[in-house]
């Protein structure tokens, strides 16, 4: 009986020692002053309107991934997504930022949009996971000039300004059809100036109009001429939102 108990105690003690040694080994794998991070990347590129399909921005393989420290890319820590390490990455202790992006970072563009995600994380002799979701930094603007505009005006356009554009601007002319992707902050108020030339060549600018725009939002501006009371009606609609706006712009009565 004593031999049996002794054997059981030896097995239990041996198992405990094995467990303890395994745990110690795991801890010893993290060198002093260092830690590990595992990276994960997602995308959320769909505008709430679902009006168009930006498929290429959903493909993770198009993205560049970086780890930054103090605003600078850590040496050897930049990859295209297919080459991004799937195992844990060793880093010295400190504060870092995971950044992933695709596209050209421009204040406004008709050709493309810029999609980016950032996430800060800290290494403190431990193992962490840093996950980032990439989203467009821009809102989308579409202008729809009613066909009757040509009955009253030789030329017409809208000039937009945003914080990112600074002293510059971008215009939507009467023949434009492609949406403009504008880099904006959340609930930024963008400004619009309406430029009109009537059939007699008289010019007018209607400015000081502002509209709210956020990343992933789609602003649709409908411009319709009204042939009474010398007014042009401007209907502003935000897709999939109940916050529609109606704005009337008064111009001289002899224009119509």
Each language-model region and where it sits:
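Extracytoplasmic cysteine-anchoring/structural motifs
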Residues: 21-256
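Sec-dependent bacterial lipoprotein signal peptides
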Residues: 1-20
């Amino acid at each position: 009986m004593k031999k049996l108990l002794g054997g059981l105690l030896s097995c239990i003690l041996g198992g405990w020692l094995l467990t303890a040694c395994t745990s110690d080994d795991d801890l010893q794998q993290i060198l002093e002053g260092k830690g590990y991070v595992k990276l994960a990347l997602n995308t959320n590129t769909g505008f709430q309107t679902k009006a168009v399909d930006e498929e290429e921005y959903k493909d993770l393989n198009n993205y560049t991934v970086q780890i930054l420290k103090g605003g600078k890319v850590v040496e050897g820590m930049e990859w295209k997504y297919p080459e991004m390490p799937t195992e844990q990455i060793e880093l010295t202790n400190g504060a870092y930022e995971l950044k992933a992006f695709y596209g050209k970072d421009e204040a406004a563009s008709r050709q493309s949009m810029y999609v980016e995600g950032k996430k800060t994380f800290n290494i403190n002799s431990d193992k962490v996971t840093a996950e980032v979701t990439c989203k467009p930094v821009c809102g989308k603007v579409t202008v729809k000039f009613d066909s009757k505009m040509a009955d009253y005006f030789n030329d017409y356009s809208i000039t937009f300004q945003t914080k990112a554009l600074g002293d510059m601007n971008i215009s939507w002319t009467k023949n434009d059809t492609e949406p403009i992707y504008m880099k904006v902050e959340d609930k930024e108020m963008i400004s619009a100036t309406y430029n009109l030339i009537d059939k007699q060549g008289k010019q007018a600018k209607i400015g000081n109009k502002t509209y709210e725009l956020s990343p992933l939002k789609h602003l649709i501006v409908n411009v319709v001429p009204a042939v009474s009371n010398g007014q042009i009606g401007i209907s502003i609609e935000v897709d999939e939102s109940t916050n529609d706006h109606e704005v009337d712009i008064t111009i001289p009565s002899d224009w119509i």
